[in-house]
From Swiss-Prot:
Role noted for this protein: Catalyzes the formation of N(7)-methylguanine at position 46 (m7G46) in tRNA.
Pathway(s) served: tRNA modification; N(7)-methylguanine-tRNA biosynthesis
Organism taxonomic ancestry: Bacteria, Pseudomonadati, Campylobacterota, Epsilonproteobacteria, Campylobacterales
Protein EC: 2.1.1.33
Name this protein carries in UniProt: tRNA (guanine-N(7)-)-methyltransferase
GO cellular component terms given for this protein: tRNA methyltransferase complex
GO terms for MF: tRNA (guanine(46)-N7)-methyltransferase activity
Stretches that traverse the bilayer: none
Keywords: Methyltransferase, S-adenosyl-L-methionine, Transferase, tRNA processing
Species assigned in the record: Helicobacter pylori (strain J99 / ATCC 700824)
PROSITE patterns assigned: SAM_MT_TRMB
HAMAP family: tRNA_methyltr_TrmB
Gene name of the encoded protein: trmB
Pfam families linked: Methyltransf_4
Highest taxon of the lineage: Bacteria
Amino acid sequence: MPHFLAKLDSKPLEYPLIRGDFCFHREFLSLKHPTKSCVHASFKNDVFLLQKIRRAGDFLIKSEKATPLKREILKQALRIYSQSFEVISHNLQENSKHASQKKALDLETFEDFIQKNQAPILIEIGFGSGRHLIELAKNNPTTTCLGIEIHTPSIAQALKQIELLDLKNLHILQGDGRLVLESMPNHRCEKIFVHFPVPWNEKKHRRVLSEKFLNEALRVLKPRGFLELRTDDSLCFEDSLKLALKNFQCEIEIKKNAQIPVVSKYEARWNKLKKDIYDLKIYSLGLDENPTQNHALDFSFDTITIDKESVGAILKTPKIIKEGYFVHVCNIYENKGDFLVELSMGDFDWPVRLFVLLAENQVFYLNKSPLKTLNNHKAHLLLQNILSQKELDERDHRSE
């Protein structure tokens, strides 16, 4: 991670510090850990935070992961900020020109990606080695393709192939495919592929394909678009088939041991062992003219008045756990009566770290809002109650 170390006796800074397109607005001091602070900064329209940690013999100054920037811009920001200190050491050298420039999307940048790509897209969830995904993109050069994966080595391997093959229509997102679909607008997918997911026969609630997932898939698929499940696990196939048969929004197509043009490494292994492979293709009929979607969920805050006394009570709030979501106030930072609240919150499947700024009678998420899912919205409403102290007044701190 880009950072630098500075001497403790470095001169105090005067804010705001403006250098070109960079502005370091002010420094918020932690009310929980006196050795920590956050520097509120911006580059053009991008807002970010720097962490400043006082140690035994130096300051450590680095990026705050909850407010990400492109790596080279972040390094430039730290290089500029370091000019106001007596630097002991750093790792802020410019990257090699030969370094890979292709990066994975994340859940925080996904909404921007969807807004820029209005045409229906092809999605593969859990692409593993990436063989099927790469061929999908090669065979559909004018269609935007998206691979969703949580396994970092698989993502790195796919990104390398994308760069080598110059596949400009293929993008990779690191995240939970269930949450990605839930946050998407209606009728934005042409096809969704789920090939050889972990069957989770002993923990079925962890499966990708559930009743909720199927409903979301049918919502985001355009009419006659399809979700394709390919699996070697008969129980997983049978349970998925039962889910599809109960849903009146779709029609299904079943195949067994079908030959397909692209065979994954996993499938090739089972073919050698003569193991059965099942295909379940679920077509969206598009019967629901106004399907419910989460894309319009409101993550703004009502007006909140806060002072040091109420901040102390909020900071002492224990983690509040509800069914499927939670809110944890991790820390609060202060600067002349304005407050920066550090949070861990949201859906249990993919919790996020966020910062909320309370300044000049305004309350808003700094840098990014939570992904627009139902559980994240419930967590947002709970946070609204915590900050306005409604949840504190009700004494609802018990874990459910």
